[in-house]
Design a protein with these regions (language model features):
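A generic structural signal for short coil/turn motifs at secondary-structure boundaries
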Residues: 8-9, 38-40, 46, 152-157, ...
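Substrate-binding/catalytic cleft of secreted carbohydrate-active enzymes
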Residues: 73, 77-115, 121-268
Length: 425
């Protein structure tokens, strides 16, 4: 569950954690913005005197010790997050070299890398003691740390150079937990001695009728990284509001869409899903990115004022399903499959556990009309997507993710399964 400490008054943290715990989550995730923690410009690379990590440390301790939640941290240095500067401090512009043709931030320029290491050395050392590897057996702690963010969406040269520098900073600063990134092809099945130790994950922001893409894309991710967990870093939990633009509650991402993307991710073989946002919060004191409203309500499961939306109860139901069948689900095989009969808008698939338990997933892609009838599922016969798959970026634009033939989920062969269905719009 995504919940940012810097978007919520500390007096309300405990309530938000309680609600997340009651919804069945075992982990919370947060970005860690550089500009939030080093607001005053240092005198140079070796000056760490202006860092203040006291609030994030309190947030981590509350999550882990009071509520028994694992934690995931994502310190960027670029975080996007509809946040001021994408997490970069404004004072960093003073050190931007003149005469550069390309965008300096996120680049492989050695001066940018040096400042990124300045940040990573500090934040990793500050959080190292909160790692689960430093905790007594049975206690919770940080289980994952992310480097960079959605690097596929940024066109620049030498990405491997920056990623390797960040990896080295994490390890040299005492962090020994697994390192991951998201939507960063340079780390998928890499043969580099360091980047091969970083697993990639996916972000799913899909159209109203495109929830099945989550199943295909997760199956593809598992195929590309067979030894890594299938993790959705950001599973669409809503959308942000824009000044003079559409508000969060006007977005199509309703409770039905929320449920569909969750179940379809599980069909594809997800081993972890992080709803972004599960609680959105507020942009205090102008910390939102340009064009963002003060509210970061996100039409999330837990609203800005702490109320529970319909999405909350869908999340709770999915959590109960996962808790009931976790051992079977996490070791199951399968995915989307061909079907005989059934409505045109019906999509489905099967996952089979080691003990023979079969999980059938069905979804109605028609947002207007309910469907009912009978269908025969044919596990082992792949039902491939008819069109290319897209993600929706922060500008509302479609970004091509994978060609239609990319996913391969023909991993099980069991007898056909006959199912009667009655699915709402």
């Amino acid at each position: 569950a995504a919940f940012h400490y810097f978007r919520c008054p500390e007096e309300l943290w405990r309530d938000r954690f309680r609600q997340i715990k009651e919804a069945g989550f075992n982990t919370v995730e947060t970005y860690v913005p550089w500009n939030w923690h080093e607001r005053i410009m240092p005198s140079g690379l070796n000056d760490n005197s202006h860092f203040d990590f006291s609030d994030v440390k309190r947030w981590l301790k509350m999550a882990q010790e009071e509520f028994g939640l694992y934690t995931i941290v994502r310190p960027g240095p670029f975080i996007c997050a509809e946040y001021s500067g994408g997490g970069y401090p404004r004072w960093l512009a003073k050190f931007c070299p003149g005469g550069m043709d390309d965008f300096w931030l996120r680049s492989a320029d050695h001066r940018h890398i040096s400042w990124s290491q300045h940040w990573f050395d500090a934040v990793c050392k500050a959080l190292a003691d909160e790692q689960i590897t430093r905790k007594p057996v049975g206690e919770k702690g940080i289980i994952l740390i992310q480097i960079e963010n959605e690097y596929n969406h940024h066109g620049c040269y030498g990405k491997e150079k920056l990623l390797k520098a960040l990896y080295q900073s994490v390890r040299k600063s005492g962090m020994d937990i697994p390192i991951f990134t998201c939507l960063t092809n340079e780390c998928r099945s890499s043969e580099d001695v360091e980047l091969s130790q970083v697993f990639d994950s996916d972000n799913y922001y899909v159209g109203l009728s495109s929830a099945p893409d989550c199943a295909y894309r997760m199956a593809n991710l598992r195929k590309e990284q067979p030894d890594a967990p299938g993790f959705v870093t950001e599973l669409q939990g809503g959308w942000f509001s824009l000044v003079t633009g559409r508000l969060s509650e006007d977005h199509y991402s309703d409770a039905r869409h929320f449920k569909a993307v969750g179940l379809m991710s599980l069909l594809g073989g997800a081993g972890g899903i992080n709803y972004y946002m599960f609680f959105g919060g507020t942009h205090f004191a102008g910390w939102g990115a340009r064009g963002m409203t003060t509210s970061y309500d996100y039409n999330a499961a837990i609203r800005e004022n702490g109320a529970r939306s319909d999405k909350y109860f869908e999340a709770k139901a999915i959590g109960q399903f996962i808790q009931a069948f976790e051992p079977q689900l996490v070791r199951s095989e399968g995915g989307p499959c061909a079907m005989e009969g059934g409505a045109k808008s019906l999509f489905g698939g099967v996952r089979v556990a080691v003990d023979g338990t079969r999980f059938v997933f069905l979804h109605n892609t028609d947002p207007k009309n309910a469907i009912r009838g009978k269908v025969r599922l044919l596990p082992g016969k792949m039902n491939r997507p008819a069109t290319p798959m897209y993600n929706i970026n922060q500008h509302g634009e479609k970004v091509l993710i994978a060609a239609s033939e990319a996913a391969d989920t023909d991993s099980v062969t069991v007898s056909p399964i006959n199912v009667s269905y009655d699915l709402p719009a």
